[in-house]
Amino acid sequence: SGSCSLKTCWMQLSPFREVGNRLKQKYDQAAAVRLARRRRLEPVNQRFSPPTKMDLVYLETSPDYCMRNDTTGAAGTAGRQCERGSAGTGGCELMCCGRGYDSFRATSTERCHCKF
């Protein structure tokens, strides 16, 4: 009698946090390019090497989200509340775009409808 063995291979995605970190790294290193002859991409800054298939590139710069833009409907960031200690997108350093910010302390009293 014969015997047979079965092998199964599968591919699996990396953990979500790792994928996000890699994508953020690519975003931070993205290079501006323009369309050259024969539909080839070349870097806008000639000091850089031509992009590879693994590089993230862009043709147009992003709008300035700090400033109000009625054409695109962007409200800008002036007047918004920020988180003073945060290093993230909601943090004052990033959200206030170098304009500075006012700090204030607020106390709120609300009924909690607690039952004991």
Curated annotation (Swiss-Prot):
InterPro entries: Wnt, Wnt_C. Glycans are attached at N69. A lipid is attached at S1 (O-palmitoleoyl serine). Disulfide bonds join C82-C97. GO terms for molecular function: cytokine activity; frizzled binding. SMART domains: WNT1. The keyword Secreted applies. Keywords: Developmental protein, Disulfide bond, Extracellular matrix, Glycoprotein, Lipoprotein, Secreted, Wnt signaling pathway. Pfam families: wnt. GO terms for cellular component: extracellular space. Palmitoleoylation is required for efficient binding to frizzled receptors. Depalmitoleoylation leads to Wnt signaling pathway inhibition. One of its GO terms (biological process) is canonical Wnt signaling pathway. It is found in: Secreted, Extracellular space, Extracellular matrix. The keyword Secreted applies. Ligand for members of the frizzled family of seven transmembrane receptors. Probable developmental protein. May be a signaling molecule which affects the development of discrete regions of tissues. Is likely to signal over only few cell diameters. Belongs to the Wnt family. This is Protein Wnt-5(I). It comes from Eptatretus stoutii (Pacific hagfish). The lineage of its organism: Eukaryota, Metazoa, Chordata, Craniata, Vertebrata. The gene is WNT-5(I).
